[in-house]
Regions:
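Short beta-strand-plus-loop segments that form exposed binding edges in beta-rich domains
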Residues: 141-148
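Primarily membrane-embedded glycan-assembly and transfer machineries that use lipid-linked glycans
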Residues: 173-503, 531-688, 695, 767-770
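Disordered, acidic Ser/Thr/Pro-rich linker "stalks" and the adjacent N-terminal cap
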Residues: 27-84, 93-95, 116-122, 154-180, ...
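Extracellular carbohydrate recognition and processing domains
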Residues: 112-132
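Aromatic-enriched
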Residues: 701-777, 783
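Hydrophobic transmembrane alpha-helices of multi-pass, membrane-embedded glycosylation machinery
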Residues: 510-515, 523-537, 678, 693-701
């Protein structure tokens, strides 16, 4: 590949030279910027590429060895043409969704606008040209808008416009994407580091650590590459795969190779620390905000897409309820936008949250007065001001486009604390950014509690899976959102509480996690499994069921957890019903979720997704058919395919539940609860980011002698393999296919874990074990 790229670039350079000579003969117009170096530049990487006469192939990736990167909205480059020159044609080849300003000056101090270089609809690098009548000595190109990921391949200016087929006749080359170069360095470092982890031995002399020098050198080159790329948003996947792979090698070395190749604990610990820090950093993009503030022309910490849904739903739930978000958003946009005409409604598409069907603005226009009437005049003005922040920040097109999502789907229990947080805060970058810090603080608290409960090494493995999985990504992750990881933290803290013997508190916390997002309640339901196994063993031994007192003595921990869960459910349902009304909150939420949970969605994962998949009816395949609307036809095909395979769905579901219940035998209560989470993708149809709970699964098999525990190693290796499999799934650009592949990965991994734990349970608690005659014995789940 390198040789091919070298040949291509050599040919391109020769073409530049040949075209230059032919231009002399034919008196073609001269590019006034050809070969010039910038007079001034700010925040521009490789400015020499801007005037080297070489363009990227149309549609190529935005960041390659042919392009120059503008690192921020304040980046610019200025050129001195050597004197006043007539300007009639300009060319800029840049990333399609970038917006630039070309300015002119006679003295290099006073600038006037010459050309607004707008965005292009087609993806990748795209050339823009314009004809004009002007003159200048100095030219400036500055980034002004777009997604803040700016790159330019070429700038050209002409006193006379070149003849057709310009600019197609200019030299082009396919650049090597920077992500490939970074990925190669990650691969080299990973291979060297992995080899060292496997080969080194604790008993060998210190001289063996000379082998670490190539590892350190490769690591330095990798870090230098990423520092040069910063800020970056699409180069994290290789780092996530690296963290998962190295952590898996550490646990393999300790669990399976310790007798002959006993590792040095300091090396293992240092490797895990590196993996955990890397994985944690990739989730938070190493501190770089994800979204662009169109009003301020820079990046913002606010997750604008997520918070434009959950901020208003929380603050104005009494008015919006679960069906009014998009109608009110549209009405506020109309009121806030001078010149918006009724005819413009025909171009607006939004999801009707009553039935999840898509409709045009014209079709719902008659409902806008009704949604305004839900508000008092003062509250409506407040809502308008808050939504104006989001429409200004997102831009009108993205703001209106976001109304094709599914609204806010959180339960009334989630809405309660979010309402208390936002009710007195006007929507602003400061207020929502501060609220967005709640989640990382909660996550760090969870990691600290896991450290105190299970030890540092377990905590490091948990952090690695937390950051290395791709389940939390759907275009972006939830960095910058508020209370979107609270349910994960509640499940983790509940696990730690039960590990410490605080079963009432553990049950309460796990039930709280279930009340926030519903399907995590599987952990709470599995509190019944130890009681069921105790009753089965008692009946098998004595042919009668145990008394309530005997169950209380044997399974007191499970009963205390159930009481804690019941207290949580009853109190919070009562409180939210008192605040918001039971019918307007819980019944309305139930109706909305019943619609949302069964309708096809491209980023949903699980057994239902796999069984609804037909490669001949994917959106990609349907898009190649004439007269086909791929996404509408795709949804119909999903429903029909799943309906035909529904019996298979129930058969696999019953098998998974049986394995899950069998895996619970002989295990402690917190382990049983986490095993219950393994059934979520079999029973439900969750969005991919809700499967982020996989990072908690190492706690289901955490044992005191971790470095010799093969069960922990098997589970960790399976989870790491899932992370690696997700890395390869990212090559698929069609979202329905990508998340179908990730569904296969998820189900295969969980099936292996369930089968292994079920097989192991037969040794932890032999089938139908006899009970002592004197008194009922506590099962392992109570110990």
């Amino acid at each position: 590949m390198a040789a091919a790229c070298f040949c291509a670039r050599t040919c391109a350079v020769l073409a530049v030279a040949l075209l230059g000579s032919s231009a002399t003969v034919q008196a073609e117009p001269t590019n006034l910027l050809a070969g010039r170096q910038p007079e001034r530049a700010k925040g521009v990487v490789h400015p020499e590429r801007l005037t080297d006469g070489l363009l990227s192939n149309e549609g190529d990736e935005w960041l390659t060895d042919v392009t120059s990167r503008f690192t921020s909205v304040s980046s610019f480059v200025e050129y001195d043409l050597g004197g006043d020159k007539t300007l009639r044609c300009l060319l800029v080849q840049a990333d399609n969704n970038d917006v630039y300003a070309m300015s002119a000056s006679s003295d290099g101090k006073s600038w006037r606008s010459l050309w607004r270089v707008g965005a292009e609809p087609s993806p990748g690098m795209r050339a823009r040209t314009t004809q004009l009548e002007g003159s200048a000595r100095y030219l400036r190109l500055a980034a002004t808008g777009g997604d803040a990921l700016y790159s330019v391949a070429e700038i050209a200016a002409y006193s006379e416009c070149p003849r057709a087929p310009w600019p197609a006749d200019l030299p082009h080359a396919h650049g090597i994407p920077v992500s490939e170069a970074a990925g190669i360095k990650v691969l080299i470092f990973g291979l060297l580091a992995g080899a060292f982890v496997l080969v080194h031995r604790r008993q060998w002399p210190a001289l063996q650590y000379i082998l670490a020098l190539p590892v350190l050198g490769a690591g330095w080159m990798m870090v230098a590459e990423y520092v040069g790329l910063y800020p970056f948003f699409d180069q994290e996947p290789p780092l996530r795969a690296l963290a998962a792979g190295l952590a898996a090698l550490v646990v393999i070395k300790e669990a399976f190779l310790a007798k002959r190749w006993a590792p040095h604990r300091a090396v293992s610990l240092a490797t895990l620390v590196f993996c955990a820090v890397t994985a944690f950093g990739t989730y938070y993009h190493f501190g770089m905000p994800q979204f662009f503030d169109q009003a301020k022309g820079r990046r913002t910490l606010v997750h604008t897409w997520d918070m434009r849904h959950y901020y208003p739903v929380a603050k104005y739930f009494r008015e919006l309820r679960f069906d009014g978000l998009y109608l009110a958003s549209l009405a506020a946009y109309i009121d806030n936008t001078p010149g918006f005409r009724p005819a413009d409604l025909a171009h607006v598409r939004l999801r009707d949250l009553r039935d999840a069907e898509m409709r045009t603005g014209t079709e719902v226009a008659g409902q806008l007065a009704g949604i305004r009437a839900r508000f008092s005049p003062a509250r409506w003005q407040e809502f308008r001001r808050d939504m104006k922040y989001f429409s200004d920040t997102m831009g009108g097109q993205d703001y209106l486009g976001s109304m094709q999502d599914h609204g806010g789907n959180a339960t009334p229990v989630w809405i309660l604390p979010a309402y208390l947080i936002f009710k007195n805060w006007p929507a602003s970058e400061l207020s929502i950014s501060l609220a967005g810090l709640i989640d990382p603080v909660l996550v760090l608290l969870l990691f600290f509690v896991i450290w105190r409960t299970y030890g540092m090494r377990i905590m490091l493995y948990v952090v690695v899976i937390w950051g290395a999985t791709d389940f939390y990504n759907f275009g972006s992750n939830l960095m910058g959102s508020t209370l979107r990881q609270d349910w994960l933290v509640a499940l983790g803290l509940g696990t730690c509480a039960m590990k410490r013997g605080r079963h009432f508190l553990g049950g309460l916390l796990m039930a709280y996690g279930g009340l926030i997002r519903a399907f995590p309640a599987m952990a709470t339901f599995f509190f019944l499994a130890p009681i069921g196994w105790y009753a089965f063993d008692y009946w098998h031994a004595r042919r009668r069921l145990p008394s309530l007192g005997q169950v209380r003595q044997a399974e007191g921990s499970a009963l205390r957890a159930l009481v804690g869960a019941a207290v949580c459910v009853v109190s919070l349902v009562a409180l939210t019903s008192a605040m918001f009304g039971f019918s307007a909150s819980w019944l309305a939420w139930k109706q909305k979720i019943e619609i949302h949970a069964t309708g096809p969605s491209t980023n949903n994962v699980g057994l239902r997704n796999v069984l609804a998949f037909n490669p001949n009816l994917s959106a990609k395949a349907l898009s190649q058919r004439p007269q086909s609307g791929p996404w509408g036809d795709w949804a119909t095909a999903q429903k029909m395919t799943f309906a035909a395979r529904r019996p298979l769905f129930y058969g696999i579901l019953l098998l998974a539940v049986a394995l899950g219940l069998l895996a619970c035998r002989g295990r402690t209560l917190e382990e049983v609860a986490l095993i219950g989470l393994l059934l979520i993708p079999f029973c439900f149809y969750p969005s991919n980011y809700y499967c982020h709970f996989v990072f908690l699964l190492p706690l289901a098999v955490a044992r005191p002698l971790l470095d010799r525990d093969r069960t922990f190693a098997v589970v960790l290796v399976v989870l790491a393999a899932m992370c690696l499999g997700q890395y390869f799934s990212l090559a698929e650009g069609w979202t329905d296919l990508r998340y179908t592949y990730q569904s296969f990965i998820l189900l295969a991994g969980f099936a292996i874990i369930l089968a292994y734990l079920a097989w192991e349970s037969l040794t932890l608690a032999p089938w139908a074990r006899p009970l002592p005659a004197a008194a009922p014995a506590a099962s392992a789940a109570a110990r």
